[in-house]
Amino acid sequence: MASPREENVYMAKLAEQAERYEEMVEFMEKVVAAADGAEELTVEERNLLSVAYKNVIGARRASWRIISSIEQKEESRGNEDHVASIKEYRSKIESELTSICNGILKLLDSKLIGSAATGDSKVFYLKMKGDYHRYLAEFKTGAERKEAAENTLSAYKAAQDIANAELAPTHPIRLGLALNFSVFYYEILNSPDRACNLAKQAFDEAIAELDTLGEESYKDSTLIMQLLRDNLTLWTSDMQDDGTDEIKEATPKPDDNE
């Protein structure tokens, strides 16, 4: 008979298939609670947790961007009544974003980072911590934005130190970290030069060791390398003309083997 932990993993997969991501988060939170403080999640479990939260936050991030864009248009037209309604609605989405980010950040700080024993799991969770502080920095303002940006930077830097020491340049988690860290420099810190340097270095180091890639991670690694290159192309053209194409980020997959 399956243990409660195995049952919750199965239910999380079921919720994912049904695209019921809020429930997927709940099942995976039960898995984290069931794992003893000193016991790591399996690679499959941590990927399921990441996918669940990424989808729940992703829907709200998309909503926030759409509403913010409409707000700008209405402001430029001088429709003050509409702007007031939009601001109120945006604030509701921001409350949801804050709650979701705080939920996973609490889990990371209280359990997941402390129980991580391997280099790849430490980098995985620290990258995740950086990602969710970055999502807060996307919409927070003033002192709250500054704090979120500082927390993002320290989490990504801690992850980068471990990744550089313990993971190959072609490792999908190391590449995914470089991708998201460079997006942070570009979007949050408005440092296109730093963003491009970080992305280019990660890409070049991976290219130099491409022949050492195992078959199981080849697809994941080359996909992220392509995203790094896409962003580099976009950013270098943006520095010449103010483009607004979509910036690529690392997206977790439930079947990652790394």
From Swiss-Prot:
InterPro entries: 14-3-3, 14-3-3_CS, 14-3-3_dom_sf, 14-3-3_domain. Residues 238-258 are annotated as: Disordered. SUPFAM superfamilies: 14-3-3 protein. Residues 245-258 have a biased composition (Basic and acidic residues). GO terms for biological process: protein localization; signal transduction. One of its GO terms (cellular component) is cytoplasm. Belongs to the 14-3-3 family. Homodimer. This is 14-3-3 protein 6. It comes from Solanum lycopersicum (Tomato).
